């Protein structure tokens, strides 16, 4: 079954999870099933649970993974909410690919792309908050904080001022109108559209992406089983993953100013498998340009 989405770093994912044999594999971001299909094919003794909050993606994946129906099941919802319900399972591996799928980006009705007639950006179409409310209803100081923190936009004040002036004329109702507004006043850097970081910031706010991955990592640390691999697409997420992995690998819990260790120096939960994040090969980057910003980190908990 042909997928509308190319899974990033698929070979690297398979390599990280190659030692797995039996147990459960949790795909926290099932999407269109590319990673899950590869794992199920490579590990005939693994059972897999796929999680996603997008009903369209789940519908597609159920059909794609039908040949593995005896070893595959799914849960609809946020992975930060589903993971705690799986704690008692013999988990061998956990994967999370934190990004927007190609189908979500390319489907104009979802309001993610620069040319969309809608301004939406909800990964879960049934969620209450959308980009329309963020752009048109948030006060200026809150918008500025979002652009500064989630988009790391240096001229966030200028951007908010432009949006505020535009709102006086009427509601901004399409992603295309917003991207054109930004394009008129901000320069393109290389091949990067000037609205890229602003759209990223709005999407993160709409879907609570940083809160979601933070809560999930907290739960994964409590589960403390098997191998974990996280694929992120921007520096904020990657930094969060890096810090959690570092915390899990710390043997000493004493404060930095402590004269000597008094905690026993035996608190590490496991080891970091990737000293530096794995990135797409030149071949993959060329075949799938959206893989260029992908970074994968992996960790193994002590058995």
Curated annotation (Swiss-Prot):
Catalytic activity, reaction form: cytidine(1402) in 16S rRNA + S-adenosyl-L-methionine = N(4)-methylcytidine(1402) in 16S rRNA + S-adenosyl-L-homocysteine + H(+)
Recorded GO CC terms: cytoplasm
EC class: transferase
Pfam families: Methyltransf_5
Single GO molecular function: rRNA (cytosine-N4-)-methyltransferase activity
Record keyword rRNA processing present: yes
GO biological process, one term: rRNA base methylation
This protein's record includes keyword rRNA processing: yes
InterPro entries: RsmH, SAM-dep_MeTrfase_MraW_recog, SAM-dependent_MTases_sf
Compartments it resides in: Cytoplasm
EC number(s) on file: 2.1.1.199
Gene3D superfamilies: Putative methyltransferase TM0872, insert domain, Vaccinia Virus protein VP39
Binding positions (S-adenosyl-L-methionine): 33-35, 52, 79, 97, 104
Keywords: Cytoplasm, Methyltransferase, rRNA processing, S-adenosyl-L-methionine, Transferase
Family to which the UniProt record says this protein belongs: Belongs to the methyltransferase superfamily. RsmH family.
Matching HAMAP family: 16SrRNA_methyltr_H
Main function: Specifically methylates the N4 position of cytidine in position 1402 (C1402) of 16S rRNA.
Protein name (Swiss-Prot/TrEMBL): Ribosomal RNA small subunit methyltransferase H
Annotated source species: Wolinella succinogenes (strain ATCC 29543 / DSM 1740 / CCUG 13145 / JCM 31913 / LMG 7466 / NCTC 11488 / FDC 602W) (Vibrio succinogenes)
